Amino acid sequence: MAELTAAASDSAEPARSEPGAAPALPRRTGRLVLRPFRHGDEGDVLAYRSRDDVVRFMPADPLQPAAAGDFVAERLAATRIAADDDRIVLAVEHEDRVIGEVLIKAGQLTDRQAEIGWAFNPEFHGHGLATEAATELLAIAFGELDMHRVWAQLDPRNRASARLCERLGMRREAYFIQDVWFKGEWGDTSIYALLAAEWRAARGA
């Protein structure tokens, strides 16, 4: 995990954004476009969400073809944080193909904290694309959305996601043992987190 030297608490607290923040979209990185979902994405989404290895550590079953339309439709308008528990879900596009998705889910707006998450097509693993997408996700969370802290929860057996959290500079703050009944067995949970001050320091901002 990357070492971060910024103090966790700055004396000057940044101005708080008004509820209803909507980041400018789409977002373009070196190789990716992060954009709202749209009709026509169903086939690409099905290509990864229907895989057992993708949903193994997620609270979801493999996506069925008949449900792909509803899955995409539910995410079409998930582009702003306007109230407690709202979420932003963006398609990750690479060379005109949706290869995954990223998520920001707010808690209480007054706390300025959000959960982040992701899912990617394993066909594209090993090229740094997940890191590229998640890095831009942090820029949205700590930039336009003005979050104070972001966190991710994952099954510790999901080493790919754990390594991604570590590459992002997130630290493991908690490890809960058999705290959830998950897909027929008791499972553990790891919590990773990062503060805005740490994120800015790591970027030299």
Describe the predicted segments one by one.
Residues E144-Q153:
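Conserved GNAT acetyl-CoA-binding A-motif
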Residues E166-F176:
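Conserved acetyl-CoA-binding loop of GNAT-fold acetyltransferases
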Residues M1-E123, I140, E144, Q178-D179, ...:
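GNAT-family acyltransferases
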Residues V98-V102, L154-C165:
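Membrane-interacting alpha-helical segments
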Residues R149, I177-Q178:
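Short, Lys/Arg-enriched C-terminal cap helix and immediately downstream tail that follows
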Residues F120, G126-G143, R159-R167:
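Conserved acetyl-CoA-binding loop-helix of GNAT-fold acetyltransferases
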Residues L154, S161, E173, E185-D188:
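Short histidine
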